[in-house]
C-alpha cells in the first residue's frame, strides 16, 4: 500500500496547490451539441476532458457537465462592421476558454467591465475561472482531422479538402 502521508510543510503546500490546480479551469477542448445562431450567437457544448476525483487513495474520473448558452467568438471588427461567420454544427469541435472573471457585466453592458469587488451591489457575481463564463472558439481539432494542401503563402476561405476555395495572396 502506498504511503500518502505528508512529510514536511513544503510537501503539504505542494499537495494543496496540486489539489487547487486540479479544480482550476482555464481552457479545454469541447464538442458542439447544439448551435443557436442568435441573436445572440450561442452553443451548447460538452467539454472533451474529464475531472479527476480523489477520495482518499481512490482516484476516479468523470465528465464535466454540458454547458449551454456559451458565447461564440468570431472574428469581428466592430467599429468597421465586418464579421466572419462560419457554419457551426453538432459534432464540431473548438476551444472553451474560461475567463479570469465573470462575463455577466461585460456581456450585458458591452463595454469595459468593472473589477470584481466583493460586496459591490453593481456586480452580478464576482466569480473567477467558472465554467458558467466559458466562451467557445470554433476550429480546434484533433490531429486526426487533416487539412489538405495548406497554403503557406495566401489567406484562404476553403473546404477541408481544398476542392472549393477563394485564395488571397501576394
Task: Identify the function of each model-found stretch.
Residues 2-170:
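Hydrophobic packing positions characteristic
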